Amino acid sequence: MTSIAEKWQKEWEKAKIFEANPDRTRNKFFTTVAFPYPNSPFHLGHGRTYVTCDIYARYMRMKGYNVLFPMGFHYTGTPIIAMADDVAKGDKELIDIFKNIYEIPDNVISKLADPLFMANYFRDEIKKAMKEIGLSIDWRREFTTIDPEFSSFIVWQFNKLQEKGYIVRDTHPVGWCPVHHIPVGMHDTKGDMEPEIGEFVLIYFNSDLGILPAATLRPETVFGAIGIWVNPDVTYSIIELDGKKMIVSERAAFKLTFQFDNIKNLGSIKGSELTKYKAVNPITGKEIPIMAADFVDPNVATGIVMSVPAHAPFDYYYLKKNKQQDMQIVSVIQVEGQGDTLAKDLVEKTNPKNKDDLQKLTEQVYRIEYNKGKMKDVSSLVKPEFVNYFKSFIGLSVPEARQKVTEFLIEKGLGRKIYEIMNRPVYCRCGNEVVVKILKDQWFLDYGNPQWKALAKKLISNMKFIPPEIRKDFEFVTDWLQKRACARTRGLGTPLPWDKKWIIESLSDSTIYMAYYTISHKIRQYQLKPSQLTYDFWNYIMLGIGDIDKISSETGISKEIIREMRNEFLYWYPLDIRHSGKDLIPNHLSFFIFNHAAIFPEELWPKAIAVNGFVLYEGKKMSKSLRNIIPLRKALRIYSPDVVRIALTSTADMGSDVNFSDSYAKSVGEILRRYYEFIKELPKYDGEGSEFANNWLKAQVSSIVLSSTKNMDNIDFRSTINDILYSFDSYLREYIDMCKADGKEPNGKLLREVIETWIKLLAPFAPHFAEEIWHELGHTTFISLEKWPTAEESSEDLYYILIHEYHKRIIEDSQKIINYYYKGKPSIVKIYVAEQELMKVLREAVQILSNGGTLKQLMEKERPSDKKLANIIRKIYELAVELDDNMKKLILGYNINEREILELGTKYMSYKLGIPVEVYDVSKLDKSKYNKEALPLKPAIIVE
């Protein structure tokens, strides 16, 4: 099938069918997907997001929309430079991956040390992969983020943001590369991890050696601190900070130099030596021991932790382990319905086996006490001079107490805040661990600006999200998002217009580039120079602001061209949907929302975001260490493009991870081949079929068209593929069996119509295969441009579907009886149907149940004259409870005669069971011989 794919890709390109131009007679649909960093070839994991976007674009194109699906390449920032540096350094692991996984020739690998060569080489590789997998892209609009023309657009964007007060120069904590001395964001790190910065509160515990600054996320528990933990196997540094002598881990001493200017290193001491000393709780004034614990991580905060066993499972566990649990445990937080010592109680109850168990308990205690905890009266625990202040703490919630304690400690000089990478370790692409730096005089996008947040929230409230549950993720990110460094001193990209020593970083120049796609090809077509693309030019194109005569005169661009570009922008904008992976929600996608809200009027705000999960290979995450990275182009050669497209999008819903497996991919290829063979044999079917079978098949096809359309609208590709690839296959087989059972040849004309409908439904997923079949059926048009099938809900269609479903139920029940009671082959199946008047009772029972009613209501309505009839009504009610949805639809929607509908299917039932089937009224049943009864839709089945 790979050769078929190559054939149709050439035909599409030759016919330019995916080049989209404004057409005022048609509704437009503008879709984009995050453009890639060309710092390595695509692997299977990349494929899902891009194919998802393409399938939806193809679907909307077949729905009659004028679809624009463009593509560019993201050269900005450090990802490319860092990768090129690794090649230049001779990174063995990277070179091995390039050579043995991606099969890059040695003579090319040596050239990849040049960042621009790398970017251009991998751009070409990625572009080939995109074409080979069948993405329906308008390549005229391609650009890179270091094109001077695009840079002029970014300069305009940043000037607009500064005008609005959304760019500020400030001091703020940022993720930082300690080697290259630049801020680090998600796309600057290995594994694309966003450094999550959090606050620790340092509490100063005095000792004879100096201050032990215990780092905590829970300063409100300091009243219950009965000891200090240090790691005995670690070397600690003695430093001077703010004129105070302090003891912290060596790693902490290094990291704190990025947050404070006034640090001096005075010496070192082993953790085991520290345990010979005592410390003083600065709030209670009590002397407490310094204790050894190997759970203390010297890489987290200061490497010094206070021991609060009443509220920290680790602390109680290690006291117990060290046989120190008799130390007085001080509880300061009360949770209604829980004991005073929640941490202790949970440790005793669950008996944790390892640090992972303890971590889970810690998170549980933290969550319960944070959400439900109230402060006890702590005034009796504190120094006399603090009593009056802390008297007011009784009854405070934990969040309130946390804030007040933090403020008190800082005000009294008993503590301070520091910052830490909460999801550590995070590594810069250069290989060094990221730290937090308090960055001074840095340029920030002020996402914490209340006015800007309000605009972003308004945009989110009017947006569609797929899957819908991600809306809350965007709302959460919008709430916590604050200042973000928007420029670097290293990397490729656009200089900050008012401070050119800074380069705008990669997550800041990729927020509104979708607007640039609308006119990028016009810039190329009219050979416009970067110098012509001024602030006023962009202001007019994007916002309609300015005097066109003046702009034309100043730029040398004709008014006709300017108007044409403005009109093209207005035709395509706003963006209808943005596709991406779920990892970009907390950064790129949220910044995309903020920047659109800041710059464009509401009518040009994006309409929807679709986010998909990741791709596993054989159930495991693809990684260098597992050596299971599968290059996309290699997968396309092995399985074919259409098989890969289906396998990447059909085994999970949008928000979940897809598992790409060799066996499933091969099974997809096999079913496509089976369809192909069936279609080749269509000419041999020249009969008329049976009336019931024909009507049933048409009904099933209409049902699939309706469900597929609904599922495609919601980007539910898993359900769609299940319908059009698997259900459709079973319906075709069943139809042929139904015709055979009736002694009729299948209707060839009907089968051709059905196949033509099916191939249109499949076209967005397997466009190359669909084009081939479409043309083999004698068509000369591109199926990619055909109309998506339509259908209307029909009670008649549903009737045929439900009746046949009932026939299959009878077959299933009969087969169970045969399998259970007969070793040999029986001679006949006799079906005895209940009295027709009982059908009305069943209908009443189903209606009552659907309204939440009971058996009592059914009895009151039917008023049985004797116990025997009452017993039958009770059994009918119980049957109604057990009925599946299809049988409920049948009983409620149609005035059926059970015997007649069963007689419609006797030939089919006989064919499937391999023995004659006869239908009788229950009055014909010999009760002396068979102790059976018949209920409506549950006839008595006798096998002889």
From Swiss-Prot:
Which protein, by its recorded name, is this? Answer: Leucine--tRNA ligase 2
Q: Which residues form the signal peptide?
A: none
Instruction: Report which gene this protein is encoded by.
Output: leuS2
Q: Which UniProt keywords apply?
A: Aminoacyl-tRNA synthetase, ATP-binding, Cytoplasm, Ligase, Nucleotide-binding, Protein biosynthesis
Q: Name one Pfam family in it.
A: Anticodon_1
State if Aminoacyl-tRNA synthetase is listed as a keyword: yes
Main location per UniProt? cytoplasm
Q: Name one GO biological process term.
A: leucyl-tRNA aminoacylation
Q: Where in the cell is it found?
A: Cytoplasm
Q: Which SUPFAM superfamilies match?
A: Anticodon-binding domain of a subclass of class I aminoacyl-tRNA synthetases, Nucleotidylyl transferase, ValRS/IleRS/LeuRS editing domain
Species whose genome carries this gene: Sulfurisphaera tokodaii (strain DSM 16993 / JCM 10545 / NBRC 100140 / 7)
Q: Supply the EC number(s).
A: 6.1.1.4
**MF term (GO), any:** ATP binding
InterPro entries (UniProt xref): aa-tRNA-synth_Ia, Leu-tRNA-lgase_arc, Leu-tRNA-synth_Ia_arc/euk, M/V/L/I-tRNA-synth_anticd-bd, Rossmann-like_a/b/a_fold, tRNAsynth_Ia_anticodon-bd, Val/Leu/Ile-tRNA-synth_edit
